[in-house]
Amino acid sequence: MLKEDNRFTAVELFAGAGGIALGLEKVGFNTILLNEIDKDCVQTLRNNRPEWNVVQKDIKELDFTGIEADVVTGGFPCQSFSHAGKRLGFEDIRGTLFFQFARAVKEIQP
């Protein structure tokens, strides 16, 4: 949905250093919320883009209902499935975070 400034909106989950939001910004999107749990990544985000709404919290603790966004993006951890790792899949807590991403999409309904 276009907002007052006629820009599409996005939410970025597992934001890391905000690479997806930066790319979307270049094509005119307004990222209205970035979620990241890692304190160093959050500090980087806040230092580089103080105007961004960065939420440092475990995604499992966030309620996304009521958030209006056109796009939900995110780079959820893949170590649990990577050939370079132990490939523990859903037995590794990181392997279950995809389901939190899916929950966010369901609650936001972009």
Tell me what each language-model feature is.
Residues 1-110:
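Conserved active-site and SAM-binding loop architecture
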